[in-house]
């Protein structure tokens, strides 16, 4: 089945191998995929893990959102993704800490014996000014996910400077946590 999936993806043998190797590891994985827009990052992850996703969300483009309500719109969209994957939460989270707590609740209701793939696409778009997004992501990873052998968190984005500054070169809670 993995071979059939990989055949649909042309010219990405190394990336496919790396992602499948990470998937097979018996430890928590925080994988960061970044690069220019429209080069197939999202397609690669969705094709490889489409039947293994425990949660998938794509950030809303801030260029098309209006004014002060950007964070609220991002949280509403994240909540919709939680519900789509079976969350029983009754209200839209009012903060990213609440949103990631709702994600933890969703994942804890799922089969803990199988690898849980969490894919957050266009991650930089979720980090609006004063939203506390990076702090909440750090809390999710360090406070919960990093202690779960079955978690594979894949984040993706085309804002390479944001990815580099906030994740790969992070000197805070995500320092040296990413693959």
What do these predicted ranges mean?
Residues 1-179:
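Phosphate-binding site recognition
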């Amino acid at each position: 089945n993995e071979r059939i999936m990989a055949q649909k993806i042309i010219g990405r043998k190394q990336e496919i191998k790396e992602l499948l190797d990470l998937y097979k590891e018996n430890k928590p994985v925080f994988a960061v995929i970044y690069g220019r827009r429209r080069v197939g990052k999202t397609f690669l992850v969705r094709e490889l893990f489409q039947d293994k996703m425990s949660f998938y969300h794509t950030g809303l483009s801030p260029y098309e959102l209006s004014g002060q309500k950007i964070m609220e719109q991002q949280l509403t969209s994240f909540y919709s993704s939680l519900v789509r994957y079976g969350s029983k939460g009754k209200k839209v989270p009012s903060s990213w800490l609440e949103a990631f707590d709702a994600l933890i609740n969703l994942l804890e209701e799922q089969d803990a014996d199988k690898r849980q793939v969490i894919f957050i696409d266009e991650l930089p778009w979720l980090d609006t000014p004063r939203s506390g997004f990076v702090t909440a992501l750090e809390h999710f990873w360090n406070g919960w996910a990093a202690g779960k052998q079955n978690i594979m968190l894949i984040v993706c984005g085309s804002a390479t400077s944001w990815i580099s500054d906030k994740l790969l070169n992070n000197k805070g809670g995500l320092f040296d946590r990413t693959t």
